[in-house]
């Protein structure tokens, strides 16, 4: 069973789309799940299944710790049911306007370094 990369992006965001396209190149190593963050957090979105308290905590954590990320990536281990935050910003080159904005070698390194169960995320 492969680990899963969960990509939280915004609709109509060209950077999010380019990151998603680039990450697809890792699909032989990971299952990839794309999540529209706005739809996810809507009142009737998928996050509503968590209940009001957990949902509110999740929204608060996103706002507090991930608001400076255009797109967020987590890796998930389905066997242990643990998640790890992947610091994608280290792999992005914002001077590029296509999927080459993601340096896949750096991203792979960040995915491997991401530690399960650490929250809030440790960023440099």
From Swiss-Prot:
Induction: Expressed in the intermediate phase of the viral replicative cycle.
Record has Lipid biosynthesis as a keyword: no
Transport recorded as keyword: yes
Main location: host cell
Disulfide feature: 13-16
UniProt-annotated location(s): Host cytoplasm
Keywords, sorted A to Z: Disulfide bond, Electron transport, Host cytoplasm, Redox-active center, Transport
GO cellular component, one term: host cell cytoplasm
Subunit-level organization: Homodimer.
Known function: Glutaredoxin necessary for virion morphogenesis and virus replication. Functions as a thiol-disulfide transfer protein between membrane-associated OPG128/A2.5 and substrates OPG095/L1 or OPG053/F9. The complete pathway for formation of disulfide bonds in intracellular virion membrane proteins sequentially involves oxidation of OPG072/E10, OPG128/A2.5 and OPG088/G4. Exhibit thioltransferase and dehydroascorbate reductase activities in vitro.
Family to which this protein belongs: Belongs to the glutaredoxin family.
Name of the protein: Glutaredoxin-2
Organism classification: Viruses, Varidnaviria, Bamfordvirae, Nucleocytoviricota, Pokkesviricetes
Gene assigned in the entry: OPG088
């Amino acid at each position: 069973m492969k680990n899963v990369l969960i990509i939280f992006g915004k609709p109509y965001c060209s950077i999010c789309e380019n990151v998603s396209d680039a990450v697809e190149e890792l699909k032989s190593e990971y299952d990839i799940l794309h999540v529209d963050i706005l739809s996810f957090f809507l009142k009737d979105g998928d996050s509503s299944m968590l209940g009001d308290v957990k949902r509110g905590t999740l929204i608060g954590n996103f706002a507090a710790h991930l608001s400076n990320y255009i797109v967020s990536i987590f890796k998930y281990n389905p066997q242990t049911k643990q998640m790890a935050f992947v610091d994608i910003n280290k792999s992005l080159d914002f001077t590029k306007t296509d999927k080459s904005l993601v340096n896949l070698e750096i991203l792979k390194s960040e995915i491997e370094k991401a530690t399960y169960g650490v929250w809030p995320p440790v960023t440099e």
